[in-house]
Amino acid sequence: MTEKINLTMKFSLDKEKEEQARDIILTVFQALQEKGYNPTNQFVGYILSGDPTYITNHNDARSLIRKIERDELLEELLKSYLTNQ
């Protein structure tokens, strides 16, 4: 039983989900900018709370963001950040 506690779990998205997440992030980012919101603040609010009202309905962004889980969204954002450093 204690052996399981010491193991590290692995989380990973398949390529198709990665591409879908990336496309959704870019679309939502653009919609937030078009409506005059700070996309960074709105994404953080959504990721931390799970409340979709942080995301605008403009260009169907709110329904798009709900197509991916928040952990998948966070993984894609973090991966992009770390890759571009």
Curated annotation (Swiss-Prot):
User: Matching InterPro entries, A to Z?
Assistant: IreB
Spell out where the chain crosses the membrane.
none
What the record says about family reads: Belongs to the UPF0297 family.
Q: Report the PANTHER family cross-referenced here.
A: UPF0297 PROTEIN YRZL
**NCBIfam families named among the record's database cross-references:** PRK05473.1
Q: Provide the protein name.
A: UPF0297 protein Amet_2459
Source species of the chain: Alkaliphilus metalliredigens (strain QYMF)
Taxon lineage: Bacteria, Bacillati, Bacillota, Clostridia, Peptostreptococcales
